[in-house]
Amino acid sequence: MDFLVLAQQCAPAVHPQTLAAIVKTESGFNPFAIGVNKGGLQLTRQPTNKAEAVAAAKTLIAGGQNIDMGLGQINSENLTRLGMTVDEVFDVCKNLSAAALILEDNFTRASAKEGAPQEALKKALSAYNTGDFARGIKNGYVQKVSTNGLK
């Protein structure tokens, strides 16, 4: 299925091209991608199917690792807040929906502080990456998403 169609179906509140730019930056469109954060263990290879991804993610989380999962690289610490399981986070539609919810929440909070929509979007993207309205701008993440959105 075409990604833009999938994004529209699963996350209609976020422009499909915006979501595509985030996903390209986060996972390179790999639905089974796992990123280990904070100097954690590195995977010797990325999972190639959902069963491998779920098993690897559960093992990493049980071992105390902080990880990002799936297309939108949903952080393991967000699963409870989002009402998701590890199995669900590797469902492409649920992952895109979760990514959109996180971005929407960030945008709502940023908009309350920043009137200009484009500036609020930059801050929302920054928070998507780092949890902070400024760090994702400083570390180049927001620029990378912007560049990926133009390709």
Each language-model region and where it sits:
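Early exported N-terminus immediately downstream of N-terminal targeting peptides
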Residues: 34-39
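Eukaryotic N-terminal accessory cofactor-binding modules
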Residues: 42-44
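Non-catalytic cell-wall polysaccharide-engagement segments
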Residues: 1-18, 25-33, 46-72, 76-151
